[in-house]
Amino acid sequence: MGWNPVMNFAPLPLRSTLDLYKRQAQELLDAHRSGDSRAIQILHEHHPRFLDTKIPWLPKNMPESEIRSAALELDDARLAIARCYDFKDWAALEEHVQGVFRDDSPVLRFESAVEAVIAGDVAALKSSLHANPELLRARSTRVTHFDPPVHRATLLHYVAANGVEGYHQKTPRNAVEIAKTLLEAGAEVDALADMYGGHYATLPMLVSSCHPAKAGVQVALVDTLVDFGAAVEARGSAKWSSPLMTALAFGYRDAAEALVRRGARVDSIAAAAGLGRLVDAARMLTTADPLSRHRALALAAQHGHLDIVRLLLDAGEDPNRYNPDGNHAHSTPLHQAVWAGHGAVAQLLVERGARLDIQDTIYRGTPLGWAEYGGRTDIATYLRAHGARTTAELEE
């Protein structure tokens, strides 16, 4: 197959003309019609026709041949391209392009500052803030396909690299300097944006993001935000409003410990379980409510705290319940222990009655399927020795 631009699809620069986006759409359509596998992947991941109706970010479980044979028109390709940039539709992308091409546009000023934030360009950011100090309170006006459609992120939210459009979720090595530049200039440290169906400050978004963790700056950013007054306790009632419980839920133990060091309270059995504090967990056990105990087992298994898992099982917690909402509720404690590579915890759960045939509710994988997909060879061998099968094997 000859070279096709879609195979090298990448986001266009900020001030790209609408014609360039149209060209991307035409290339996508042409590549789909020629059977290009990259084009099929883009359509599968971004066109609503090929996404799950209940879990709108999840591609349907369908063969590539079905997408290849689908009758698609230019409007379909344009919609998919708009969704690659996380816009709601082509009209929203077109409105954005019009905004960034007006020299006096607040959209251009804000989006240019976003580019400086995610690129780690301190000089450009300072220049933008000096010329337009209102940027410190400005909000994104993008119309996305998220819940809710307009996330209203501030520039500081972009430092967290979470809850905003995917191609802007980047963490430069000097993210701490970027954050300090914004905060020293007067950015509101706990401003709320509309993300994931709730209202969130930067801190909980930071401690649930893989990008600052992979860049090695997540803990330093926690300290920076707290230095400037960020609340370490929950603000509001959204699912992930507690920075500590959010960090634990997403597996960022170092960030969780940093929050405790900076004053976050360990005042629930779930928090104690996630942090591996056996004495505290045992002390809280008798007075903990059922949901807290349920959450505690989920977190203890996810983080590999064997003694706390045993404590909770001895107290009657059921290893076969799906985890509670906000703690990978599509999976069981065994799924999470397997995925994180906690072999001893997985073995204990199996010994205490954890079923091997329960499928997660998103990917329909059994614990063995998770082990094999995640490269947990020793755990997979153990599970197979105890009769485990993958979903495909169970359906044979």
Question: What are these model-predicted stretches?
Answer:
Residues G2-S127, A131, Q169:
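Intrinsically disordered, low-complexity eukaryotic regions enriched in glycine, serine
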Residues R137-R139, A191-A193, A234-G236, S268, ...:
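Ankyrin repeat boundary signal
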Residues E115-G120, P149-V150, Y158-A175, T202-Q218, ...:
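Ankyrin repeat A-helix N-terminal signature
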Residues R152, Y196-H199, K239-W240, R293, ...:
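Start-of-repeat signature of ankyrin repeats
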Residues A124, I178, L221, D254-A255, ...:
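Conserved ankyrin/ankyrin-like repeat signature
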Residues S105-H151, L155, L275-A296, I308:
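N-terminal segments that cap or nucleate solenoid repeat domains
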Residues F101-A113, R253-L275, V279, R283-S292, ...:
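Ankyrin-repeat-protein effector appendages
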Residues L129-L135, K180-E188, D223-A231, A258-A264, ...:
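Ankyrin repeat domain, specifically the short helix-to-loop turn at the C-terminus of the second helix
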